[in-house]
């Protein structure tokens, strides 16, 4: 049964990825959008401008999806087909690879056609920057950076957590990532309340972002990129970004495309100056299609790793954990039996001594 469930988990991840690639995000009744509305309602009820309230909000908003995933896992522990179907549905729900590549392609088409106003209107689908004063190179840079970071957030990380932790991992990761987008940014309202959500998202993306960087280096030639240059830029610049994770993805993408990312980012009401990543010219419209191609190749590579995990490493880890638990239980039983026997012998000795 354990082997069948492992195969079902892997098959569900592959099927969910295929659904996302073919259909993209659901146009109506998207579960993630529904979660966002529920989380927004919860925030309005529990909000206080302190970290304790934010931690409680994060624990509840992430804990419920994790418990739902755990209940579904228990309910399908002897039903491989049911597990595969639920895993496929959850994977499709939490992935955003097709939508990400589509937005990059649309932005590239608008910029190549000289329609900067249309590109500015479209930028909100990718990031939260203020597009009103951005020219073509800055719009292209914002798009490349968003594609790089969201390849990790919307593709690699969900697949990785789905492989390692199954349904609870898929749902819990997407919940945490959604909360980070809602309350994890720097603003007067969320400076303290959003700390827990931001830190949790950083923690959950530590490994996926680095894997995304490595995979971006590996697949750079699929978009006529230089693997050696991508490797050098990634090693040199990945830790210069203020985010512990975004720089991993953006530095690798900058090296793969041969462009320079970073600079001044303007948001609504504030601006940030980021270190430069890469050595080339500023991105142009022609780079967006290549960035989308790299994102797709990284997603396929991550899928291969994720699908292999449940039937290889995960299976071995499960067997090892089961062996440890069985040995621990056997040792505990032996110790308990020995203690009981000694106790019984001591009591018998006391009764015998009293009789004499």
For each predicted feature, which ranges?
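Short amphipathic, positively biased membrane-proximal segments
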Residues: 1-356
């Amino acid at each position: 049964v354990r082997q069948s469930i492992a195969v079902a988990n892997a098959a569900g991840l592959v099927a969910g990825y295929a659904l996302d690639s073919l259909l993209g995000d659901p146009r109506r009744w998207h579960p993630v959008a529904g979660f966002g509305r529920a989380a927004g309602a919860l925030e309005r009820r529990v909000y206080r401008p302190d970290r304790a309230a934010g931690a409680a909000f994060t624990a509840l908003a992430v804990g419920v999806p994790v418990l739902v995933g755990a209940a579904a896992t228990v309910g399908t522990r002897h039903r491989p087909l049911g597990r595969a179907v639920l895993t496929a549905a959850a994977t499709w729900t939490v992935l955003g690879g097709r939508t990400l590549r589509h937005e990059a392609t649309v932005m590239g088409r608008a910029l190549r056609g000289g329609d900067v106003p249309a590109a500015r209107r479209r930028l909100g689908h990718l990031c939260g920057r203020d597009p009103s004063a951005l020219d073509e190179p800055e719009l292209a840079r914002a798009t490349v950076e968003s594609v790089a970071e969201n390849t990790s957030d919307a593709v690699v990380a969900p697949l990785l957590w789905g492989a390692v932790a199954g349904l609870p991992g898929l749902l819990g990761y997407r919940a945490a990532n959604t909360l980070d987008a809602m309350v994890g940014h720097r603003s007067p309202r969320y400076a303290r309340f959003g700390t827990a959500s931001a830190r949790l998202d950083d923690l959950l993306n530590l490994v996926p972002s680095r894997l995304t960087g490595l995979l971006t280096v590996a697949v750079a030639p699929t978009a006529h990129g230089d693997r050696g240059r991508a490797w050098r830029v990634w090693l040199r610049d990945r830790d210069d970004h203020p985010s512990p994770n975004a720089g991993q993805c953006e530095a690798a993408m900058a090296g793969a495309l041969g462009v320079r990312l970073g600079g001044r980012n303007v948001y609504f009401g504030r601006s940030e100056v980021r270190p430069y990543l890469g050595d080339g010219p500023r991105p142009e419209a022609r780079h967006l299609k290549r960035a989308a191609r790299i994102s797709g190749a990284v997603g396929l590579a991550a899928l291969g790793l994720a699908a292999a995990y449940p039937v290889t490493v995960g299976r071995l880890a499960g067997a090892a954990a089961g062996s440890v638990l069985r040995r621990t239980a056997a040792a505990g039983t032996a110790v308990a039996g020995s203690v009981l026997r000694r106790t019984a012998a001591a009591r018998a000795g006391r009764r015998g001594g009293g009789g004499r």
